[in-house]
C-alpha cells in the first residue's frame, strides 16, 4: 500500500532532526541529487527593470562557497559551525562535501566577513 503525501509529511514532522538528516542523505543517494540544489537562491526582487548598462551594476548579494578545507579540516569545521550555526555533524558534512555553499544571498560585508573567518581557519573560499 502506497503512503499518501500527507502521511509522509506527518511521518517526517514526527522525526528528530538527526532522523531527517539521515532521510535526506538516503534520498540524495537513492535519487542521485543533492539537497543544496533545492535551496537555490531566489531571483532578486524588482529584476525586470530594463535599464541600460545592467551588466555594469554592482553586485549586492553574494553566495559564499567553500572550495576546499585545506590542511586544517577541524579548524574549518569549527569556523563553519560559527558562521552558520550548524551542529557538528552537519558542519562536518558541509566541509567534507566541498565545494559547498555556506551562505547564499549575503550582503557584501557579511560575505567578506564569512570569507575572512573561513580563510583564517585555512579554507579556500569563493564569492559568487
From Swiss-Prot:
Superkingdom, taxonomy of origin: Bacteria
Keywords, ordered alphabetically: Ribonucleoprotein, Ribosomal protein
GO molecular function terms listed in the Swiss-Prot or TrEMBL record: mRNA binding; structural constituent of ribosome
GO cellular component: a single term: cytosolic large ribosomal subunit
A Pfam family hit: Ribosomal_L12
CDD domains: Ribosomal_L7_L12
The keyword Cell membrane appears for this protein: no
InterPro entries: Ribosomal_bL12 (IPR000206), Ribosomal_bL12_C (IPR013823), Ribosomal_bL12_C/ClpS-like (IPR014719), Ribosomal_bL12_oligo (IPR008932), Ribosomal_bL12_oligo_N_sf (IPR036235)
SUPFAM superfamilies reported in the protein's UniProt record: ClpS-like, Ribosomal protein L7/12, oligomerisation (N-terminal) domain
Key word Ribosomal protein present: yes
Swiss-Prot/TrEMBL GO biological process terms: translation
Family listed: Belongs to the bacterial ribosomal protein bL12 family.
Function: Forms part of the ribosomal stalk which helps the ribosome interact with GTP-bound translation factors. Is thus essential for accurate translation.
NCBIfam families: L12
Complex and partners: Homodimer. Part of the ribosomal stalk of the 50S ribosomal subunit. Forms a multimeric L10(L12)X complex, where L10 forms an elongated spine to which 2 to 4 L12 dimers bind in a sequential fashion. Binds GTP-bound translation factors.
PANTHER family xref list: 39S RIBOSOMAL PROTEIN L12, LARGE RIBOSOMAL SUBUNIT PROTEIN BL12M
Name of the protein: Large ribosomal subunit protein bL12
Lineage per the UniProt record: Bacteria, Pseudomonadati, Pseudomonadota, Gammaproteobacteria, Chromatiales
Gene that specifies this protein: rplL
Amino acid at each position: 500500500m502506497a503512503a499518501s503525501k500527507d502521511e509522509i509529511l506527518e511521518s517526517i514532522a514526527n522525526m528528530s532532526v538527526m532522523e531527517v538528516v539521515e532521510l535526506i542523505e538516503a534520498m540524495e543517494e537513492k535519487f542521485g541529487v543533492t539537497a543544496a540544489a533545492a535551496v537555490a537562491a531566489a531571483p532578486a526582487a524588482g529584476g525586470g527593470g530594463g535599464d541600460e548598462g545592467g551588466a555594469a551594476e554592482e553586485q549586492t548579494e553574494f553566495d559564499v562557497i567553500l572550495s576546499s578545507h585545506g590542511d586544517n579540516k577541524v579548524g574549518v569545521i569549527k569556523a563553519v559551525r560559527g558562521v552558520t550555526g550548524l551542529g557538528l555533524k552537519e558542519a562536518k558534512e558541509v566541509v567534507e562535501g566541498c565545494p559547498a555553499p555556506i551562505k547564499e544571498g549575503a550582503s557584501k560585508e557579511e560575505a567578506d566577513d564569512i570569507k575572512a573567518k573561513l580563510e583564517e581557519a585555512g579554507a579556500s573560499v569563493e564569492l559568487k
